[in-house]
Amino acid sequence: MTVCRFWQQGYCRNGNACKFEHPPKGGQNYNRFGALSGSGQGMGGRVSEPPHYPGLSEDAIQKDLTSELPTWILSCYGPGRDAPEQLFGGYPREQSFEEIRLHFYNGLMAGNPQGALNEIQAAYQAAQQQIQNTLQNIPAAVQFILDAANKHPNRIDICRESSKGSSTGGSVFGRNVNPFQQSSAAPLNPFGAPSTPSTSAFGQPSPLGQKSSAFGTPAFGQPSQPVSAFGKPSALGGGSAFGSPQTGSTFGQPSVLGAKPSAFGQPAFGQPAFGQPAFGQSAFGQPSALGPKPGAFGTSAGSAFGASTTTAPSPFGAAAQATQPANPFGQPSQQAANSFGKPAAPASAFGQPSTTTAQNPFGQPSTQSSAFGQQQPQQAGTFGSPSLFGQQQQQPSNVFGQPSTTSAFGSQAATSGFSQLGNATSTIGASPAGAQAPASKSPYHPGSTRQHPDLLSYATKNPAGGLDTFKGKPVVYETPKGAAKPVPHIRQFDGTLVRIWMPDGAPAYTADTEAEDPKVYEDEGVKRQWQSFLEKGRFEGGMPEVPPRREWCVWDF
């Protein structure tokens, strides 16, 4: 329990009702962390008892991760006040809503918002898996926290070390009291980072040399087999029972420390940030912790999203020549800059690396590649192909193969069954590598030149023949009330299920769904109504009386 600072100064108006600890006064050498000092005797000559941390119990963990689980689960969790370790946290598990939003906008600027959404979905699912693994092993979770008291450096050691380093300069966040250790002589930084002059807030070196989170390695609840959302692979059985260090970068891309730019250590478009020079400066005007690096666009150093490009005279005036397959955040054969430039041994968000790794009983990483390094199938725009009305917009080539006009919410044909009014070939990508696309029946008129995307271009199947993923999202089968068999669904970020209505792909062509007289589709009023719906999401002049042409529709929903 935290010692009351007013009690240390000789007064406390709350007395025995104070929620902070009042240690006995006198000549005793009182140490709240006496169990960590290594001595065999405590006060009064008694044998030291194992440390006790208020709030660390199986019931508390069960309650925290079930009935009191917060809505935003991409956060750290450490039960027990002043405990030497937390169950899980640190990057990439510990991210704010604003950081996730920034990640999406980076994907949107790159022309591939759906890829960013898929990666965010993978991160959310990995966090859920950590929580479930913890709930299934609560006794081991408690023991993991207790064992961390004998592993150094732990969170308590880092707090002590940061108090020594705070005398060299002002902290980035100010000189505040450390919640894990009280010292009347030197107020501590609550983030556990030593303050060094002229150091960026997002890349402070640590005197302890510890990697991972500010309080040790993000510890607990890692899935044993599922892939980590942000790329933390390791060899199964290669580490101890509590996991192994991270070898992958933020989004599944390995990186050498100092070889690639940080998302906070370079300007977004090669321009000065807040009046600072463009190269080698942080986006917040501070020098980059990794040294001078080129801008993310228009250079051969690698795109900010992992796809290597050739040098272009202007970041927006020339189409990038991709040397690797287009991928939402790229996994080229050569190492490239990942989305947020994290090195192979990622530093803490608050700069506390570690020489040892606090092991995790639920942190058996997977040998599979990161969800952020998986090549995503190319998705079409929300409504598919170019317009029938001759207003095809020529967009600049993009390394991700995505039109820049894609919806900001990455719907991409996920919410509408209509494509652009036209007969051009669909832009949805080909089947995954190694997948043999079977000959499928066309839903369009036999004389139409338009082709419907094959089912395997946006979905994968399991050995049993059922759907495994659909547009990059995992598929679950649920049996609705009154139904005879389960039907496939995809799970949204909020946990709701959305039914897949066309699990077998497009149906065969039938003229029954079109107007009897095909000449009605030549009417400008009909074209204008459907074009308005495709562009704005609503009909011009009310609901049309003419059904859409088959060539205007897709069945990938």
From Swiss-Prot:
It is a peripheral membrane protein. Residues 195-215, 243-253, 321-338, 351-366, 388-429 have a biased composition (Polar residues). The keyword DNA damage does not apply. A zinc finger (C3H1-type) spans 1-25. Pfam families: zf-CCCH_4. CDD domains: AMO1_CTD (cd23954). Transmembrane segments: none annotated. Its main location: nucleus. Keywords: Coiled coil, Membrane, Metal-binding, mRNA transport, Nuclear pore complex, Nucleus, Protein transport, Repeat, Translocation, Transport, Zinc, Zinc-finger. Residues 114-141 form a coiled coil. Residues 161-297, 315-463 are annotated as: Disordered. One of its GO terms (cellular component) is nuclear membrane. GO terms for biological process: mRNA transport; protein transport. Functions as a component of the nuclear pore complex (NPC). NPC components, collectively referred to as nucleoporins (NUPs), can play the role of both NPC structural components and of docking or interaction partners for transiently associated nuclear transport factors. Active directional transport is assured by both, a Phe-Gly (FG) repeat affinity gradient for these transport factors across the NPC and a transport cofactor concentration gradient across the nuclear envelope (GSP1 and GSP2 GTPases associated predominantly with GTP in the nucleus, with GDP in the cytoplasm). The nuclear pore complex (NPC) constitutes the exclusive means of nucleocytoplasmic transport. NPCs allow the passive diffusion of ions and small molecules and the active, nuclear transport receptor-mediated bidirectional transport of macromolecules such as proteins, RNAs, ribonucleoparticles (RNPs), and ribosomal subunits across the nuclear envelope. Contains FG repeats. FG repeats are interaction sites for karyopherins (importins, exportins) and form probably an affinity gradient, guiding the transport proteins unidirectionally with their cargo through the NPC. FG repeat regions are highly flexible and lack ordered secondary structure. The overall conservation of FG repeats regarding exact sequence, spacing, and repeat unit length is limited. FG repeat types and their physico-chemical environment change across the NPC from the nucleoplasmic to the cytoplasmic side: SXFG/PXFG repeats are especially abundant in NUPs on the cytoplasmic side. PANTHER family: RAD201, SI:CH211-113E8.11. This is Nucleoporin AMO1. The lineage of its organism: Eukaryota, Fungi, Dikarya, Ascomycota, Pezizomycotina.
